[in-house]
């Protein structure tokens, strides 16, 4: 995903 911790 757009956020590293929200892959």
UniProtKB/Swiss-Prot annotation:
Keywords: Amphibian defense peptide, Secreted
GO biological process terms, semicolon-separated: defense response
Keyword Cell wall biogenesis/degradation among UniProt keywords: no
Tissue: Expressed by the skin glands.
Any one annotated GO CC term: extracellular region
Localization annotation: Secreted
Keyword Secreted: yes
Protein family: Belongs to the frog skin active peptide (FSAP) family. Tryptophillin subfamily.
UniProt function note: Putative defense peptide.
Official protein name in the record: Tryptophyllin-1
Organism whose genome encodes this protein: Ascaphus truei (Coastal tailed frog)
